[in-house]
Amino acid sequence: MTLRDYYLHILKVSKVTRCKYHKINAKLDKLSSMDRYHSIRKLIAEHADENKARQMAQYMRHRFRFHGLPAAGRKRCYQDFLRQERRNGCIDWPLLDECWQDEYREMQYFVSDYLLALKSFLTFTDIPKIEAYVRGKQWLDTIDSLCKIIGYVGLNDSRTNLLMLQWSLDSDILVRRAAIEHQLGRKGQTNTELLASIIVNNFGSNECFINKAIGWALRDFSRTNPAWVRNFLQIHQTSMHKMSCREAGKYL
């Protein structure tokens, strides 16, 4: 049994104490990125549920394979690992790249959770790496998560604004969706000029994923500034898709 296998064996013990988890993660921290990838992969696979996996794959139109872990259970598998990574203060991009290429969707969810947990260590120069995840193995689930990470970077570096304007005109509709949604949750920190420009760039689209996103972005901001959203709808109502208007006005 290798050292890595030994620690994985310990991880399988259901009543392992938090102290032991910390010791295990400290040891895993010393492994190579590839070994860490295999460790995380095995840890998630050990909690697989075939029935739920089939249901999840069907819900996602069989685009991806699943182990069948719900979000809460999946996150419990590696919460201590992410806590240790935050202490380290360094993002393991080779690990994330391996996870993103994995055939099981939970591994892409791990990447999103990892980046959200370590978002304070991200800079504008990391966005090309995140963009590779936005464009690869893409679907609504990962797009709607990764856009929040990009939005956080944008709060600290205004260069992100121009990039999001470029994304809002991209030929890939899911890249455009990420641009539309990247300010979700910003509340009073929302850049309204940027929000308006990105939305206007997507007027005339018949894509459900785009029009829903426009409505959600406006609806989210209406919680903070309903007057701004009402005014926007009044000005642009004739140019907006009915779906966008309906979603945007739900809280008004």
Where are the model-predicted features located?
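Acidic, Ala/Val/Gly-enriched low-complexity intrinsically disordered segments
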Residues: 5, 13-16, 26-29
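Short hydrophobic targeting helices and cationic amphipathic motifs
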Residues: 8-11, 22
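Alpha-helical scaffold domains
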Residues: 24, 28-252
